[in-house]
């Protein structure tokens, strides 16, 4: 693989911007993280790798697996779900947020709405039972999915995030009576990112301040939505979480300045007279992100980078210009003067005939201005580079000669 390395001096001088320095900002929560979803870049973190109770934020994993089952054709939004005695009886427990389930039969779509809008625990359990047959088997699916995402240190005991004390005899085998689901803020960001990127339709539900369930109006627990007490423009999700152990927690998401931002605030610092501490902390964190980071397009779709080319075997032309498959965008700190390298790697094997749009190389951005681990993805940002045009096959005598030269070179 042929590599060409260039150095990019990322200097952002945006007029009169006076960014808040990272060391000067402290989110009002015990644990927190903020990321840009499309790139996976970490923009802020605070004790983000410590596994702690996350309460109903757990339902994001549940919802992901429901959407996955829909994608796989196992169920659909209109599939009826029969409510078993376990989730039905839980609706009478005042310690668990819920909706009435007296009809004992609802669609997947209705239960998704109840789960995401009003954080209905029985709705989540009913979905878990529909997908896996039992909540126990569903929890095993949740664990497997987290392993697939590289999350190794989570504790999962149910599909809802409730404390086991609320569930009576329906607790996960081998778990303790007071166990709760635990993930780190870092891991929650991974969950939220996977959900939003794979199933963006979830935002059509989570952006609703209210919805209708079985003829009654249900209200969102996310008070940052429109017409809610802690409203902030642009917020379209995602999930609250509240237990005695988890405190007031919230995963928020919004698009600001072209960035799809995900914030995780766990165990917000509660203040007397302020029931919206988690939302205030989230808004302050978003202000910090908006003031300190920006999205930059380094190569536009269809453009090459520093005359990037790729070899073509047996073509009328020996090389083809490699261009960006789509806009190549990175997130950088405002005012940063950090040297970061861009590496273009051309694929070594591609033979004519070659069609325009065929991937012929990769562009990798080696970001040096990092917060914590830098990215929630395993690799640094990299992007496909494709052939700018078609390359036809060469005349047979040229191909014969090329093969002869390669044979001689290999044997000598």
Predicted regions and their residues:
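Sec-dependent N-terminal signal peptides of Gram-positive bacterial secreted proteins and lipoproteins
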Residues: 2-23
């Amino acid at each position: 693989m042929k590599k060409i390395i260039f150095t990019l001096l990322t200097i952002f001088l945006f007029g009169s911007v006076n960014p808040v320095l990272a060391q000067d900002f402290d989110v009002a929560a015990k644990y927190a993280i903020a990321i840009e979803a499309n790139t996976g870049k970490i923009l802020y973190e605070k004790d983000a790798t410590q596994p702690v109770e996350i309460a109903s934020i757990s339902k994001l994993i549940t919802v992901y697996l429901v959407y996955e089952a829909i994608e796989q054709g196992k169920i659909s939004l209109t599939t009826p779900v029969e409510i078993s005695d376990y989730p039905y009886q839980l609706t009478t427990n005042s310690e668990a947020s819920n909706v009435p389930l007296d009809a004992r039969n609802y669609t997947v779509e209705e239960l998704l709405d109840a789960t995401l809008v009003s954080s209905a625990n029985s709705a989540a359990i009913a979905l878990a039972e529909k997908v896996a047959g039992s909540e126990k088997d569903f929890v095993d699916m949740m664990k497997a999915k987290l392993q697939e995402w590289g999350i190794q240190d989570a504790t999962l005991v149910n599909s809802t995030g409730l404390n086991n004390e609320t569930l009576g005899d329906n607790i996960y085998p081998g778990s303790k009576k007071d166990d709760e689901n635990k993930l780190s803020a870092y891991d929650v960001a991974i969950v939220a990112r996977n959900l939003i990127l794979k199933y963006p339709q979830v935002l059509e539900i989570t952006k609703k301040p209210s919805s209708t369930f079985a003829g009654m109006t249900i209200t969102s627990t996310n008070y940052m939505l429109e017409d809610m007490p802690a409203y902030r423009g642009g917020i379209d999700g995602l999930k609250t979480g509240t237990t005695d152990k988890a405190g007031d927690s919230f995963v928020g998401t919004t698009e600001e300045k072209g960035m799809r931002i995900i914030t995780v605030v766990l165990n917000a610092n509660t203040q007397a007279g302020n029931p919206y501490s988690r939302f205030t902390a989230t808004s302050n964190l978003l202000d910090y992100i908006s003031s300190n980071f920006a999205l930059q397009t380094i190569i536009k779709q269809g453009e090459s980078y520093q005359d990037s080319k790729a070899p073509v075997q047996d073509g009328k032309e020996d090389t083809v210009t490699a261009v960006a498959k789509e806009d190549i965008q990175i997130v950088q700190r405002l005012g940063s003067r950090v040297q970061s390298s861009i590496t273009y790697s051309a694929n070594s094997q591609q033979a004519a005939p070659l069609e325009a749009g065929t991937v012929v190389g990769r562009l990798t951005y080696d970001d040096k201005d990092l917060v914590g681990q830098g990215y929630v993805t395993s690799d640094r940002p990299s992007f496909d580079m494709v052939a700018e045009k078609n390359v036809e096959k060469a005349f047979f005598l040229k191909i014969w000669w090329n093969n002869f030269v390669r044979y001689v070179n290999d044997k000598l």
